[in-house]
Amino acid sequence: MASEDFRCILCGGTDRPHLVQEQVTGDASGKLRAVQCLACAHVQLSPPAYDLGLYQEDGQVGFVIGHYGTPIETVFEHSAIEARRRVARFAEHGEALVRSDGQPARLLDIGGGYGFFGSAMTRLRPDVESCVLEPSASRAETGTRHFEERGDPDFPVPRFEVGLLDEDYVARHRRSYDAVTLWHVLEHVDDPLALMARAAALLRPGGSLWIEVPNLHDELFGLSPAYRRRSYMHEHISYFSAEMLERMARRLFAGADVEVTGYQRYGIFNYFHWIEHNAPQGARPDMWERDRWWLETSWRSAREAARTSDALLLVVRPVGAQGSQT
């Protein structure tokens, strides 16, 4: 790769990068490479091509269904599990989502997909006004239809707004929300710093920004070559470490309270399957709900504490919640 072909999406460096992985899952062109910037150590795809149409047409989930054989019903089931866990995480991290002026707290879930998190918030935190901002009308319609057909009071239809978090949206909603969430969104965009800054600009004073991403230092990378190969995929432009997430947040938000913790999404049986068979579980990967409680929680807690889990959670509480300092 010639140096003129590379530009780091975080620091702008153009020196020849270090090759991390030559093949990228789902790359039909064969031209994408996973590389590491030698100036700032960020790992990204090169060239960092963002395809909005992929998400508007629900191509990401379509690939999972077609490539791994995972039924859409399982995607929905796992999304519901993740949503409940994420709602619980506010209390775990000391976020009450209660305003001092007596008005309902407001939450915006950016890139909320089918709306499972928005639905869980509506059901479990009816005192909070929650909205899902989703760029794909197709996904919002699919989610709405799923909740309506399900007819389950535990899964109400969330409030959707179809659109992008662009400068126009920020101008209309600046300082309007008490919490903004991006669950596995940041890795998909070609300017993650700008997206973080726009998201923070929506926060009221005292508000908080919640970002979850896959973990570059997932320990399973070193235990299953197939898992490592699969984890570099064409829709994920960036691959973040805990250290990089913290550096990004401190660069954007001087004086902010910044917390980066590990979070384990998939269960121990999925972990063992990758190690033993060097392959995914396929149609029903283990998400772990209530079985194997002691074993699962002990293993999960250890990975999260070491930040070698499969995901990372960044929580930022900017000073004055005014957004970017750059």
PLM-predicted stretches and their roles:
Residues 183-190, 235:
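Short catalytic micro-motifs in class I SAM-dependent methyltransferases
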Residues 190-194, 221:
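Short N-terminal helix/helix-N-cap motif within the alpha/beta-hydrolase-1
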Residues 193-208:
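A short glycine-rich, Lys/Arg-flanked "PGG" loop and its adjoining helix->strand segment in the class I
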Residues 243-277:
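Substrate-binding/catalytic lobe of Class I Rossmann-like enzymes that use SAM or dcSAM, i.e.
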